[in-house]
Amino acid sequence: MIEKSVVLIKPDGVERNLIGNIISCYEDNGLKVVELKLMKATREIAEKHYCQHKGKDFYEELITFITRSPLCAIILKGEDAVARIRSINGATSPTDAAEGTIRHRYARSKTENCVHASDTVESAKEEIALWFPEV
């Protein structure tokens, strides 16, 4: 089924000039960019995005990280996009990420892992509404 999903190239990926490399990974796997914007996440958006982590010991570090500098928000579209993107990204921790995945290639840590992607079709819809209210 054709799906849409959100990918965030996090501040560490933007700071390291990896936007083009990362987008190529998705496009080379048949996914299409349908929306893209470079933006600085506000604390309000970051807190909504990471609301499931509120109260956890890493929450403030996560909010500070995602709001420190611009990120690149993208909507990708393609066949089984949600699962395919997560496979292309690899495991959250670079030490667990399979060879050839974005996180294996570019991530520095579990937090500075370059990318976020929607984990379900439902969360993709919610994240599109959050990050792309104009769409």
Where are these regions (language model features)?
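Non-catalytic terminal and connector segments of soluble metabolic enzymes
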Residues: M1-V135
